[in-house]
Amino acid sequence: HLLNVLTGSIGTEGGTSPSAWNKFHPEFFDTPPSPDSWNELNWPKEYTLSHYEMSQILPHLIKDGRGDLDVYFTRVFNPVWTYPDGFSWIEMLSNKKSIGCHIALTPTWNETAFFADYVLPMGHASERHDLNSYETQAGVWIAFRQPVLREKARRDGQDIKFTHEVNPGEVWEEDEFWIELSWRIDNEGDLGIRKHFMSPYRKGKKINIDEYYQYIFEQTKGLSETAKKEGLSALEYMRKYGAYLVDPEVYVKNKSNLDNDEMVGTTIKNNGQIEKEGAVIGIEVDGNNFSGFPTPSKRQEIYSQTVVDFGYPEHATPGYRIKSHVHLDEMDKSKNECVLLPNFRLPTHIHSRSANAKWLTEIAHKNPIWIHTKDAKRLGVFDGDLLKITTEIGWFVD
């Protein structure tokens, strides 16, 4: 990336672009406030540079006495099978003091669902609503996934309130499930939850699934105008076509000018940063007020103050100085210490979520030990050998 910065090829034709430029970001009818506290079971202090929540070590955090969970939803998630330390998950999910109530939202019966208090069938792609948008090109597009049988029933003239009325096996549509659950939890409206699920079209009424997506599509740039040319609403257009190209070309967005309304109430600092209500919204360059890049400073950042603030000043600039605790230099070959990769993912195993798909299992029905040829030669190991692997937490035979 630094090379692209130095050659001026960020956001240009033939260059690279920030992913945020080419992915659609919907505007919702309501945005609840963010949590007012830090959840150390999701984001432990030891892993301040992690990009995602550290769910793989959740059982160990709870076992260490850092907290417990009253209610835990596992959504299309099978850690007992997928994660390396599945038995720790079994221990946690079996302990009422660790997990008060475990609900498994899953399209298939699996190892984790076995330890759930409630197993709620989750719809596959053709049984639920969803929005899709990926950075596939220098443009922005949005796609609409919708339950097949619900849309067929609508076209057949049926009045469907909930998707589970027509879904196979009465499977609930996920968006509808969360709306209904949230609404019923705050039955009297005194918990401050219901107000975030009010219809933007029917005052005081609960939002329904059609209104949920109708609002998003009506706020999508150019979609209503395109739909109107065919005598359709934005929602009807997306039901019919399933996709819409929001912007065919997205280049040099960092040079987009802030308009007069955006500049009202701003101050320009000596370093060129344009601030409004305490936030940096753009950058002033040679008298031009640009929106800049999607970074805290609105510039390309080589130095990260965030990393410094989290206590890692040695990593504030780009480099390759992070040495893992499982680096080869840390291994004692005399004790047969190796880098352990207990599981891996073949294409046919689909995120390790398809253990009970017998046809895929027949295609790839082995989970062999992968070992470097040099280590295999040193240990006298050959293809087809049955080995016992021992670690600090147990052993397995494969």
Report the location of each language-model feature.
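Long, low-complexity segments enriched in small/aliphatic residues
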Residues: H1, K205-N356
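Short, electropositive, low-hydrophobicity segments enriched in small/polar residues
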Residues: T12, P18-S19, L69, V246, ...
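Residue-level detector of alpha-helical segments with a strong bias toward transmembrane helices
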Residues: P18-H25, P32, E127, N288-N289, ...
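Non-catalytic alpha/beta scaffold blocks inside enzyme catalytic domains
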Residues: A20, E40-Q214, G292, V339, ...
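Short Asp/Glu-rich motifs
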Residues: K23, N132, P313
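Charged, low-complexity, helix/coiled-coil-prone segments
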Residues: E27-N39, N110, F115, A316-I322
